[in-house]
Each structure stands twice: as C-alpha cells, then as structure tokens.
C-alpha cells in the first residue's frame, strides 16, 4: 500500500475511534435535505510525506489527479475566481450571478503587493518564485489567502489557506496549513494538489523535492460518510504509482495538466455516492 494509504488509514481510524462527535450541537453545514451535517473530528492532525520517495496518491479509491492538478493551476497559475476558467464543475455551486466565487482563492493570489521598497509590486505566487531563486535561505517564503478584509466578499472561506516553502540544502520542503478538512471528499485531493505544486516549484527553481507536511486544524468525517470510509479501510491498497513530470518545463506558468503522468496507477473501485455537505 502507498504511504498516502497508510496515513489516510491511520487518520481515519484515529478519528473514528478517538474523535469528538458534534452530534446534538448546532452546526453550520447541512445536507441537501436540510438536515444538519454532523461530524466526528480530531484537532491538529499532521501528516508528513517524503516526496523524494514516492508521490502521495491513495489507492484505496481513485483520486482524479488530473482534475485536482487542473484546479490547482486554476488557483495558483491562472489566479482566477471565475468558474468558467476551470475544466470541471466542482465549484459551480459556489459561483455567484457574476460567475465567480468572489474574492476567494485565486483572486487573493493575484493581488499585487509592494514587498520591498524600490521593487515593482508583485503577487504572492511571483514572490515565492522570486525568493526561491534569489533568496532560498529566507524563512519568509509563504502565501496566505485567508484575507480577513475580503472574507465578506468570498462565497467560500478558504480551507487550504497557506503554503510555506523552506529550502534545506538543495531540497524544497513545504507545509500546507488547512483550517478544515473533509477526509472523504477532499483529503487526498488536496494532498495530490500541493505535492504536485511542490514538485513544480522545485523544478523551476533548480531544486530537488523534499518533504511535504500537511497540517489540518479540524480534520473530520461527516456522519453520512462513515459507511463509505469504513468500507475503504477494509481494503488493502496497492503500491504508489510513478509520478512523472515534464522535465523540459522551466517556467511555472508553462505547466498544464498534461505536463504530468501517473504511471501504473492501480486503485480500488468505489461504489458509494458521496453526499456533499454545504
């Protein structure tokens, strides 16, 4: 089984056996039928992935990795908040009448700031790219899209909100901070996205990949997802596939979802419909 499978299994078992249930409490999320969507949660989950050893994609069920990377590029490369710029319909329900998700996610990464006196303003992504090449020893290479000033104009508050990059020797390490994580629908989706981002940032900066650390504040399983999660945990996973990235790309903005391959990706069938809490 892949390392991603192992950590997913450990996290889910810990939540189910030792987590806190908010059943009976007033909660914001609800199901499509109007019934409150309750969870079992653990606080402060930290999972570490050595990207130099294997790519962290799960095999207990299929992760649609190409769609996940397409979404990441929508946020980090296009810096867009328009759902029509995305190749899937994942975000359609959060789009307003103007076809955007408000000042969330990609919008925040596209805002330009005056970082240093005398330098031209640049956005957060370009600042990361600049520092990785020119200031790799810096401890300030990070992004943060949880902008309190704009929260009232976001159709969805950012869940994965901050990336910190750290260069150790010739290796690029990264930490993703996430305030909330739905384990069934989004955990490995997010892990795949930001592991791929770390690979991209490393390649265009002339670095090797190191460790990807995923820090989750509220890590939860929804009540109606529990049967599906338990069924997944009964399976034995497969070995991780081989992650292949186009080595000729040296410009972050030149990557596309077709710049990647997942060779020999084996996964178990998943026969459950997944209701979405909103």
Per-segment meaning from a language model:
Residues 1-278:
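Terminal, non-catalytic protein-protein interaction segments that mediate quaternary/complex assembly
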């Amino acid at each position: 089984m892949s390392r991603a499978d192992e950590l997913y299994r450990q996290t889910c078992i810990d939540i189910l056996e030792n987590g806190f249930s908010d059943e009976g409490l007033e909660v914001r999320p609800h199901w499509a039928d109007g019934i409150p969507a309750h969870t079992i949660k653990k606080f402060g989950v930290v999972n570490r992935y050595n990207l130099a050893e294997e790519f962290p994609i799960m095999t207990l069920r299929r992760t649609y990795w190409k769609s996940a990377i397409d979404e990441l590029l929508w946020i980090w490369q296009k810096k867009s908040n328009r759902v029509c710029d995305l190749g899937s319909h994942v975000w359609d329900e959060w789009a307003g009448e103007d076809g955007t998700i408000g000042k969330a996610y990609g919008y925040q990464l596209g805002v330009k700031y005056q970082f240093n006196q005398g330098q031209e303003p640049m956005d957060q992504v370009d600042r990361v790219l600049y520092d990785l090449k020119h200031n790799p020893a810096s401890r300030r290479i990070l992004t943060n899209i949880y902008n309190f000033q704009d929260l009232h104009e976001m159709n969805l508050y950012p869940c994965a909100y901050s990336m910190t990059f750290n260069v150790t020797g010739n290796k690029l390490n990264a930490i993703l901070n996430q305030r909330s994580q739905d384990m069934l629908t989004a955990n490995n989706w997010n892990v795949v996205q930001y592991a791929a981002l770390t690979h991209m940032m490393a390649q265009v900066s002339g670095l090797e990949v190191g460790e990807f650390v995923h820090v989750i504040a509220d890590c939860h399983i929804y009540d109606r997802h529990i049967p599906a999660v338990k069924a997944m945990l009964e399976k034995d996973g497969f070995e991780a596939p081989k992650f292949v990235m186009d080595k000729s790309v040296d410009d972050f903005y030149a990557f596309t979802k077709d710049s990647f391959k997942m060779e020999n990706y084996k996964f178990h069938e998943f026969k459950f419909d997944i209701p979405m809490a909103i």
